Amino acid sequence: MKLIAGLGNPGGQYAETRHNAGFLLLDCLAEELKLDFRPKFQGLVAETMMGGEKVYLLKPQTFMNLSGRSIRELAQFYKIAPKDIMVVYDDMDLPIGRLRLRSSGSAGGHNGIKSTIAELGTEDFWRLKVGIGRPTAGWDSARYVLASFTKEELPVLEEILDKGIKAVTLWAKEGGDKAMNLYNR
């Protein structure tokens, strides 16, 4: 069994924001696979089969800073080891249009990842970072991540979400090393 968790904030006012890149990717994946989310584990959960293995998709509804609670609840209930968890989230240190897949690491200042590390008790879980770029001069970082993507960024976002779907699907079916080799370019 595997878990793919996409981080974001619940509520319509956050739906199209940079900080919701994880939710956006999971929504696109669920749409592609014709899956429906249902409330469970302080989140919205969908399930599917990939590579002969059950895979849960999770969008925590706890707000970003407490995302780890929802991830831990689902992982504990289904006995999913951290090495079988992928967390998809926004990353300001990557330019928009870039992905980075990692098998472990620090939170890098991301509160959703800090929460996940604290709740799982380890840094050893997979992450797919979706680049959202840095704010331009005069923008506060918090305001930037909670702002919507610009009209100019939307085509790039669409392309990167498509690549992200392929990356998490390959991770679930064939493993992280293969996915990293293909998508960390």
Swiss-Prot record:
Its EC number is 3.1.1.29. It is found in: Cytoplasm. GO terms for molecular function: peptidyl-tRNA hydrolase activity; tRNA binding. Keywords: Cytoplasm, Hydrolase, RNA-binding, tRNA-binding. The record marks 90 as: Stabilizes the basic form of H active site to accept a proton. The record marks 9 as: Discriminates between blocked and unblocked aminoacyl-tRNA. The active site is at residue 19. Pfam families: Pept_tRNA_hydro. InterPro entries: Pept_tRNA_hydro, Pept_tRNA_hydro_CS, Pept_tRNA_hydro_sf. PROSITE patterns: PEPT_TRNA_HYDROL_1 (PS01195), PEPT_TRNA_HYDROL_2 (PS01196). It catalyses: an N-acyl-L-alpha-aminoacyl-tRNA + H2O = an N-acyl-L-amino acid + a tRNA + H(+). One of its GO terms (biological process) is protein quality control for misfolded or incompletely synthesized proteins. Monomer. Belongs to the PTH family. Hydrolyzes ribosome-free peptidyl-tRNAs (with 1 or more amino acids incorporated), which drop off the ribosome during protein synthesis, or as a result of ribosome stalling. Catalyzes the release of premature peptidyl moieties from peptidyl-tRNA molecules trapped in stalled 50S ribosomal subunits, and thus maintains levels of free tRNAs and 50S ribosomes. This is Peptidyl-tRNA hydrolase. The gene is pth.
